Amino acid sequence: MDSRLHRLINLEVTPGKDVRKTAIIGTIGPKTNNVDTLVALRKAGLNIVRMNFSHGSYEYHQSVIDNARKSEQVYPGRPLAIALDTKGPEIRTGTNVDDVDYPIPPNHEMIFTTDDKYAKACDDKIMYVDYKNITKVIQPGKVIYVDDGVLSFEVLEVVDDKTLKVKSLNAGKISSHKGVNLPGTDVDLPALSEKDKEDLRFGVKNGVHMIFASFIRTAQDVLTIREVLGEEGKDIKVIVKIENQQGVNNFDEILEVAHGVMVARGDLGIEIPAPQVLAVQKKLIAKCNLAGKPVICATQMLESMTFNPRPTRAEVSDVGNAILDGADCVMLSGETAKGNYPINAVTTMAETAIIAERAIAYMPLYDDLRNCTPKPTSTTETVAASAVAAVQEQGAKLILVLSTSGNTARLVSKYRPQCPIVLVTRNPRTARFSHLFRGVFPFVYEKEPLDDWSEDTHARLRFGVDMAKEYGFVKNGDAVISIQGFKGGVGHSNTMRVSIVGGEKEDI
C-alpha cells in the first residue's frame, strides 16, 4: 500500500543514507568564487553554478566559469553545470544627489519623472525612473513599489508624458538604482536589453549550459532569446523565470517553447499579493510536471543563513514543501553568493531534500501523471513510463538510461521513480544540463564507440552499473531496469530490460 497518508504515518525522520534526487543550484559570489570553496560546495551537494548578471563584470564572471571548471579537475565527481542568469528588462530609479539615502515619511508627495536630466540628480522631491513609457501604461490609483516593495507609492496624477505625481504609503529610505515594480500593470519593455544580448553572446562563447531568462512575459520573449543565441548556442537550454503577472497569465504558451521554468518568487511576491504566490507556485510546478519539463523553485529559501549558521523552521519547511510540490531543483541566492555560511546552506538544503523526498507517495503520484498525460504518448515516453512502473513491480533499485540527447532521462524523471536514474551519455553537455531533471545522475562515457554497436551498448551499460555501485545506488542481487535504443543515434530509445546485478540473469 502506498498512499500519501500511509507514507506520512510511516515516515522515517532520522538521517539515513538516502540518495538525494533534487538538484541544488547555488549562486556564486565573492564569498564562494574560489576553487577550494567550489569543491567544498560540490561535496556538500551543489549541482549547478549560477552567475547573476545583474551584478559583476565580464572579467568577474569569466573567473567564476574558470574556477568552476578547475574545481572539476581537483574533484572530478559528477559533472557540474553552469547557468547564466540574465539581468532582464528591469525598471530602476536613478542616482541620488551625492548618492545619499533620503528618508521618506508616510503621505509624502513627490514627482517621478522620465526626464533624463534628473537621471543623476534624484532626491526626496523628484525621482528619475528609467522606463520611458511609465506615464502611458499606469493610471491614477495604481501602486508603484520601489526597492522590492520596501517603499510603496500611490499614483495621484499623470501630469504629462514624462511626469507622475505620487504619494508615499509608508515610511522608508530611498536609495540610488533601486528596482521598481508596477503590480497589475502591463509593461511593454523589450524582452532583451542590449546588455542582455551581449551577456548571452558571452555565455555562448564560454559554453554555458543553460540560461535563466529574467522577466519573461510571452512566448515571443523566449524565441527572441533563441535568436540571439543563434546556431552556435542552439544546445543551450532556456529556463524561463516567471516573476510577474504577465508571465503567469501567458504561462501555457511560454511553457510550450521553454526548456524549463523557474518560479522566481521574489519579484513575483511584489507583483502579486504574497498569499497568492503559494497558489501560483503549486499551479506552475504542477503544469511543468505534467509537461515533463524541469522546474526550479527559487528566492529566499534559506535567507536567514546569509548571516546565521542555522535556518529558521519556516525556511526548512519552505524548501521541503517546494520539493513536495514537485520542484526538480531548489536554488540558493545570497546564501551562497555573499553569505557567511555557504557550505552550511548547501548541506542544510541537501539534508532537507532527502527528508522531503521520503514523504512522497510515489505510486499515487505516478498514477496521477499517467492518467493526466494526453494519449497517445510517444514511443520513448511510453517506454519511460513503463520503466517506472516496472521499478515498483520488480522492486528495482535503479533505472539505467543510455541517451545521446538526454530526452529519455527527462521522460523517465517526469514519472518520478522512487529509485535513482543513472544516465550514461557520451555528450558532456547532455550530462551537465540533465541535473535539471529530478533523480537523474549523469555520467559521461569517454571511450570511443566500438565498431560493433551491440558490444558498445553492452560496454556502456556495464559502465553505468559500475558507476551505480561506486555511488552506492545498487549492490549484487539488486534488480536494474535499463532503457536503450534498438540502433545508434538520437530518438530510438524503445527497449526496456530487467537485469540482476551480479546474478546469473545479469547480461550487462
Curated annotation (Swiss-Prot):
Q: Where is this site: Transition state stabilizer?
A: 241
Q: PROSITE patterns attached here?
A: PYRUVATE_KINASE
Locate the residues binding K(+): 52, 54, 85-86
SUPFAM superfamilies named among the record's database cross-references: Phosphoenolpyruvate/pyruvate domain (SSF51621), PK beta-barrel domain-like (SSF50800), PK C-terminal domain-like (SSF52935)
Class of enzymatic activity (EC top level): transferase
For this UniProt record, the keywords arranged alphabetically read as follows: ATP-binding, Glycolysis, Kinase, Magnesium, Metal-binding, Nucleotide-binding, Potassium, Pyruvate, Transferase
Q: Which family does it belong to?
A: Belongs to the pyruvate kinase family.
Name under which the protein is recorded = Pyruvate kinase 2
